[in-house]
């Protein structure tokens, strides 16, 4: 059983926590997420044009890039995380350019060497994923695909083909941090996806509070929170780890106790 499979095999939903690499003391921030009870870590790769991200994560990208964070730095952060936390699943999330600049095979091999479990590439449509996805799968890395409220029955098979680890359901069309969609809409769309795949379905975008996270955990296999955590890094700087652990615990407790 892989680390991702193990995280989603529990009787409760998995809590997935996101922060941006290179923003603040990333190692301490990641450790705080684990200490707070996160089941899966998503580590954002900073990019100059993060089109799917809202103001909070865009600002985190700017802060990280201003410090000179590179793809190699992200991989080093991942490698050091894996050494400290051998059992916690780690997913890289970002955009195609940094992932394929040196070639998909290079990136996939580096991810494998650093103990990365999965990769979410936001801006490669599944119909155009002829190189990165196969390279990741060949290296034993799960290519995790995004489904949205506009992913209809005709397109869903393309999204699911070659997807591994879990399906990331984007609960609102648009950018991260937006207002959450209605729970009944989320429930029906998650159920629709699950009728077509045995993969777990995790829901993200617009989830900010323990109450929201707990409600979604009753209808999905996982809950992803990013902007609310990233905002703490921007607001509290060196004091962010304590704040992150506190919010992560509240979110994880709500997710784990929802069923």
From Swiss-Prot:
Catalytic residues of the enzyme: 42, 53
Keyword annotations from UniProtKB, A to Z: Amino-acid biosynthesis, Aromatic amino acid biosynthesis, Lyase, Tryptophan biosynthesis
Pathway connected to this protein: Amino-acid biosynthesis; L-tryptophan biosynthesis; L-tryptophan from chorismate: step 5/5
Xref: Pfam families: Trp_syntA
Family: Belongs to the TrpA family.
Keyword Lyase: yes
Name of the protein: Tryptophan synthase alpha chain
HAMAP family: Trp_synth_alpha
Reactions mediated catalytically: (1S,2R)-1-C-(indol-3-yl)glycerol 3-phosphate + L-serine = D-glyceraldehyde 3-phosphate + L-tryptophan + H2O
GO MF term list: tryptophan synthase activity
